Amino acid sequence: MSIKTVKDFSSFAGKRALVRCDFNVPLKEGSISDDTRIRAALSTIEYLKERGARIVLVSHLGRPDGKKNPKYSLKPVANRLSELLGQDVKMLSDCIGSEVVNSTLQMKDGDVVLLENVRFYAEEEKNDKNFAKKLSENGDVFVNDAFGAAHRAHASTVGVADYLPSVGGFLMEKEDKFLGGILKNPERPFVSIIGGSKVSSKIAVLESLLSKSNVVVIGGGMAYTFLHSEGYSIGKSLLEDEYIGIASSFLKKAKELGVKVILPLDHIVADDFNKNSIPEYIDSFNIPENKIGMDIGANTLKEIENVVKTAKTIIWNGPLGVFEFDSFSKGTAKVAEMVASCSGLTVVGGGDSVAAVNKFNLSDKITHVSTGGGASLEYLEGRILPGIKVLEN
């Protein structure tokens, strides 16, 4: 889909740009442990500053359940933004009300302020019209750059667009371009690598990508339900009984479409699901009845490598093993390295696979690392995201 962006807006000079960012960053004892999402918003903020806008930033943080809670204050974000932008970013004590509006009206061109957490109001997640109107009084134009919240029809992502001219920021544009490009017209061969623990959370993505892919790699905990549906023994591995038929139908449809599906050919197993469990290699599709599948084996990795090295487009979403346990993270690490060394277009989306490329310092070797967890998933499922829909041409 084609969205209107900041480049399509005639003049920002002297105008208050109400910019919805995704500053939902991890905090440890009040300090930001990963500022990726803050840095992702900088290009839009800098662009608006250069054009004389008065920048009013708005975001949510955590789940404060519609109540003011200092634990979820955006103050640490304002401090980090001040460092990154090299200027004072004033933190306002609220996100609506006459005091806040007056503060925004007294801003000078190039000033940046941050409103307090919009989720301190229950009306935010209900997309309450009155709340959206009050929020819109802090701006003259609405810029949505919060791709990570684009799948939510909330007051600050959708509601304010009813009251202000609305455009997307550069992050929103980039996500739309890369994820949209994969769904519309991927260069071939196109390989989809889908991992994660549950079929239930990934089946819609698998079905959406099946007709577009040349190869689909299925790994992680959900692979065992697919293996079981093919008659292999999976021991004590994760099994979703209600998805066995769906997994079987998916594999049948793949065969009909001529799409190659790679399932684990061999396994790293353990006696139980524990980070201290001893890894054991099984050179077979079948897993002994007293063992749990924890990661993919060397033969599976070789098979994946063969398709990845010739791929022109790769989408990777979800880890291939129990990535959070070091002894069982090798499969995911190796796949991250393969994707990073591919010369084609590579897109990584979904919290755990993004964490993997960051952990192994490979993010700069990936064409596009998506910032949206749930939003990326829903986009790849082919759903229309409300936060993007309001920006369409």
Swiss-Prot record:
A cellular component term, taken from the record's GO annotations: cytosol
Pfam families: PGK
An individual GO BP term: gluconeogenesis
GO molecular function: ADP binding; ATP binding; phosphoglycerate kinase activity
Keywords, in A-Z order: ATP-binding, Cytoplasm, Glycolysis, Kinase, Nucleotide-binding, Transferase
Gene3D superfamilies the record matches: Phosphoglycerate kinase, N-terminal domain (3.40.50.1260)
Binding site for ATP: K202, G293, E324, G350, G351, D352, S353
Record: residues binding substrate: D22, F23, N24, R37, H60, L61, G62, R63, R119, R152
Superkingdom to which the source organism belongs: Bacteria
Pathway it works in: Carbohydrate degradation; glycolysis; pyruvate from D-glyceraldehyde 3-phosphate: step 2/5
Catalytic activity entry: (2R)-3-phosphoglycerate + ATP = (2R)-3-phospho-glyceroyl phosphate + ADP
Protein family membership: Belongs to the phosphoglycerate kinase family.
Description of how the protein assembles with itself and partners: Monomer.
Protein name: Phosphoglycerate kinase
Organism for this UniProt entry: Borreliella burgdorferi (strain ATCC 35210 / DSM 4680 / CIP 102532 / B31) (Borrelia burgdorferi)
Lineage of origin: Bacteria, Pseudomonadati, Spirochaetota, Spirochaetia, Spirochaetales
This protein's encoding gene: pgk
